């Protein structure tokens, strides 16, 4: 296999060859220069001018002087130095500087409003000593007058008429009938409960029951059936309207009557669930 020479070897060979060629050229040139200096210069060649001298040309001293004087080179008149004319200064061109753009005037800042000075708190004035003035008790003149009138009525014998007696008897009979009717109706709703217990419950409710004025003005009547539970400790719970044939005004009045009369109910031996009808009527006796 052929091995190609390395690039380093090739570069060395090329440099050596170039050195030898340059050395040979310098040697040839130097030899030519030496040979040219040793060669004699040729005589005047054709076309050269001959210089001839005659004796007549030699004159006396005067001539020599004149010749010498003439030989002297004429001094050229010195040139007067030219006055340097003052250079006219060229008028400088006024460079007009560009006018600066007017800066926009800053907008005047709004002056901050002066904060209102806090008003000095008024010093608390010393409270004037309040002299305890005994309030004059209102005169009990009207009460005394009422008491006198009652005393007169008591002292004066009442004239009882037969009509009044009849009315009182009718009222008692009607109240007995209503109580009997109420107890009988209550017994119908509460079987197994004693009449005495129911009577106490009804009397307590009637003592706290109020006929609402709004219902009276509107002429509202009706009956509300209320159920509730009396516990052994005397507390009353689960109060609600079971049945009603009237408006919410009387329903609310019936519930309030049970709540306000609860503390008057007798304590049962065991927990009792009751249903009590409460009637509202505008009929006069």
From Swiss-Prot:
**For the region Disordered, what residue ranges are annotated?**
55-187
Q: Which GO terms describe its molecular function?
A: energy transducer activity
Q: Which domain of life is it from?
A: Bacteria
Q: Where is the composition biased (Polar residues)?
A: 55-69, 178-187
This protein's species is Helicobacter pylori (strain ATCC 700392 / 26695) (Campylobacter pylori)
Localization of this protein:
Cell inner membrane
Q: Does the keyword Transit peptide apply?
A: no
**Annotated Basic residues bias:** 98-111
Where it mainly occurs, coarsely classed, is membrane
Q: Which residues form the TonB C-terminal domain?
A: 196-285
Q: Which GO terms describe its biological process?
A: protein transport; siderophore transport; transmembrane transport
Q: Name one Pfam family in it.
A: TonB_C
Q: Which PANTHER family would you find in this protein's record?
A: PROTEIN TONB, PROTEIN TONB-RELATED
Q: Which SUPFAM superfamilies match?
A: TolA/TonB C-terminal domain
The entry's cellular-component GO terms read: outer membrane-bounded periplasmic space; plasma membrane protein complex
| Family membership | Belongs to the TonB family.
Protein name as it appears in the record: Protein TonB
